């Protein structure tokens, strides 16, 4: 955590002007399009694209979170990785990954399984990196809570995959930042 703070510092809260409010889409409008469900935006979203990137940084949210609001400060419209990191890490492509992280919906237990989320992360991220000619680019994961477990399982699945293109995630992973991940259960 100290390394991340040293890298980006703490975001300062600022007031949003009325013209900024009018010109910026609300998160619910900007990232739900194309999602499989309006309840949660899933898959990979590029927060900052850099044509000559030397590293990908992928944020993976935790339990009951989503790929945008988990990383967005109260009163802000954009997530801090999108607003802060490009100025500090100019050669990084910033990604976020979303999945249905709700255990219970309307008093009905969810059927989501860790391995399913991990498989989707591995497949979606591999596809995105191939489409952006980034399959061999180093990648760093920043994870929170359940997202850390999803990420670990995806990396292990990548390592053990018989498919070379899926093994690239394992081979290119340079680090994982775990924040509040229950490695030994909750």
List the model feature ranges, each with a label.
Residues 37-91:
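Short, surface-exposed "cap/lid" segments of acyl-processing enzymes
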Residues 69-75, 107-111, 153-157:
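Short coil/turn segments at secondary-structure boundaries
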Residues 66-68, 103-106, 149-151, 185-186:
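Short catalytic/ligand-binding loop motif for oxyanion handling, primarily in non-cytosolic enzymes
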Residues 63, 98-100, 182:
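Short beta-to-alpha linker loops that shape the active-site pocket of alpha/beta-hydrolase fold enzymes
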Residues 1-37:
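Intrinsically disordered, low-complexity Ser/Thr- and acidic-rich regulatory segments
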Residues 61, 116-186:
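Serine-dependent carboxylesterase/thioesterase catalytic core
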Residues 58, 95-97, 175-177:
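Hydrophobic/aromatic beta-strand patches that form the interior of the parallel beta-sheet core
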Residues 87-104:
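Conserved alpha/beta-hydrolase
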């Amino acid at each position: 955590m100290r390394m991340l703070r040293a890298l980006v510092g703490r975001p300062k809260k600022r007031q949003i002007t009325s013209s900024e409010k009018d010109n910026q889409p609300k998160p619910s409008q900007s990232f739900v399009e194309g999602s499989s469900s309006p309840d949660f935006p899933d898959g990979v979203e590029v927060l900052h694209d850099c044509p000559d990137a030397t590293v990908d940084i992928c944020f993976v949210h935790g339990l009951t979170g989503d790929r945008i609001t988990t990383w967005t400060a109260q009163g802000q419209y954009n997530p801090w990785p999108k607003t802060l990191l490009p100025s500090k890490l100019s050669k990084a492509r910033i990604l976020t990954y979303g999945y249905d992280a709700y255990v219970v919906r309307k008093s009905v237990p969810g059927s989501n399984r860790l391995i399913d989320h991990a498989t989707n992360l591995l497949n979606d991220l591999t596809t995105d990196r191939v489409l952006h000619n980034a399959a061999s680019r180093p990648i760093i994961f920043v994870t929170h809570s359940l997202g850390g477990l999803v990420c670990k399982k995806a990396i292990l699945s990548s390592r053990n995959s018989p498919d070379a293109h899926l093994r690239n995630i394992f081979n290119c992973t340079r680090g994982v930042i775990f924040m509040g991940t229950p490695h030994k259960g909750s």
